[in-house]
Amino acid sequence: MVLIVGFNLRTSIASFSPICRSLFLFPKYRSRIIRPVVLLEKPFDKHFYATDSNPLITGFPETSKNCPPSVAATKNRLLMNCTEFDDHGNVRVISGDFKKMDLCKQNGLLPRDLRKLNTSINSIVPVILVREGSILINLLHIRALIKANSVLLFDVYGSQHSHSQSQFIYELEGRLKQKSSDFGWLPYEMRALETILVSVVNTLDSELHVLHNLVSDLLADFELDINQERLRTLLIFSKRLSGFLKKATLIRDVLDELLEQDQDLAGMYLTERLKTGKPRDLDKHDEVELLLETYCKQVDEIVQQTDNLVGNIRSTEEICNIMLDANRNSLMLLGLKLSAMTLGLGFGAVVASLYGMNLQNGLENHPYAFYITTGSIFAFAAFLSSLGILKIRRLKRIQMALYHRCNLPISLDPRSLRPPYL
């Protein structure tokens, strides 16, 4: 942030050097220099702070880049970028600015309904709302408003789903341009809804395919070696799979809830309501019910595959924990054995230190005293070490109390578990 002091009106851009004038004419170089401000007040009356997001230079148009942050935020709250398709599938408006109040008035929506489609809010909860004359959908990268003769697609450019939405626009345009007879005489809104569900299922399927390949290769590597890097990678994939499973489960739950609401299913026939002016009977929604059930089963299959993959990861984690516990127990046993051997050697060192005090004990002139004492020390040290190691081995032979109480064989051979009458 740079402190800028206002200039007098006598100072003009023409008085600057050619380099300065070129910098003012090309906005991308303006951030590298100190930008003066032309004010109507007296010089040095006010102080202004100029930033890249709020350039205080007169003569430039007020755009989203040049306007103050508060003004840009207000515009973002009042406007929404949308792409509109007409009843023939042609793009009527590309990334146009629509006022939220106008959208609510034209489509009979409430502000809380439109909030669920707000692209500035990062929401992972999918939504399918059926309103009078429209269907609001928020699934993954698609946020759309379906009517009987138009589709309003809310842009999410700048996010991680921009590429997916760009592909979906071409798919939606192609399907809406086709005749209803090509889709079994489905009305306009059903074709748009089916296109959205196809895109959502394909996105989930492709993401699951990538995760499945990555996780399968990683689990295969665990059979060869377990190291810290692979454990860290397994943790990352486990988090990604958990998030994907939650996302797919929420979509399946939304479709299940919609299938249980007969009133919403009947209200999704927007073309018939527009022509007759009356809502469809509650018991006549076979087409949309079959449509939703088909894609609900596909999403449920994706959820089951993801759940199985998560189960494989958890099984691998449990096996890794068992192997790590076994290695840790082996190290503990080795430490106990070394401690037992150290105890025997320590006893021998104590006896040797007693003889090293240079005191008379009556064995100085005995011809075999040295050999007898040395042999006794080594024998007793070996006895203590062997006794400690035997005690440790007995700890390894402790069996589960279930085998002793039920008189079950300890062997894991399936033939030993057969009943006697077979």
UniProtKB/Swiss-Prot annotation:
- Species source reads Schizosaccharomyces pombe (strain 972 / ATCC 24843)
Q: How does it sit in the membrane?
A: Multi-pass membrane protein
Q: How does it assemble?
A: Homopentamer. Forms homooligomers. Interacts with MFM1.
- Put simply, this protein is called Mitochondrial inner membrane magnesium transporter mrs2
Which cell locations does it reside in?
Mitochondrion inner membrane
The answer to whether keyword Transferase applies is no
**Which Pfam families does the UniProt record give?**
MRS2-like
Q: What is its main location?
A: mitochondrion
Q: What does this protein do?
A: High-conductance magnesium-selective channel that mediates the influx of magnesium into the mitochondrial matrix. Essential for the splicing of mRNA group II introns in mitochondria by affecting mitochondrial magnesium concentrations, which are critical for group II intron splicing. It also suppresses a variety of mitochondrial intron mutations and its absence may disturb the assembly of mitochondrial membrane complexes.
Gene Ontology MF, one:
magnesium ion transmembrane transporter activity
For the motif YGMN, give the residue ranges.
355-358
Show the transit peptide stretch. 1-49
User: Cross-referenced PANTHER family, in alphabetical order?
Assistant: MAGNESIUM TRANSPORTER MRS2 HOMOLOG, MITOCHONDRIAL (PTHR13890:SF0), RNA SPLICING PROTEIN MRS2, MITOCHONDRIAL (PTHR13890)
Say which family it is in: Belongs to the CorA metal ion transporter (MIT) (TC 1.A.35) family.
Q: Name one GO cellular component term.
A: mitochondrial inner membrane
Q: Which CDD domains match?
A: Mrs2_Mfm1p-like
Q: Which GO terms are recorded in the biological process aspect for this UniProt protein?
A: mitochondrial magnesium ion transmembrane transport
Q: Tell me the superkingdom of the source.
A: Eukaryota
Keywords attached to this entry: Ion transport, Magnesium, Membrane, Mitochondrion, Mitochondrion inner membrane, Transit peptide, Transmembrane, Transmembrane helix, Transport
- Segments crossing the lipid bilayer: 331-351, 370-390
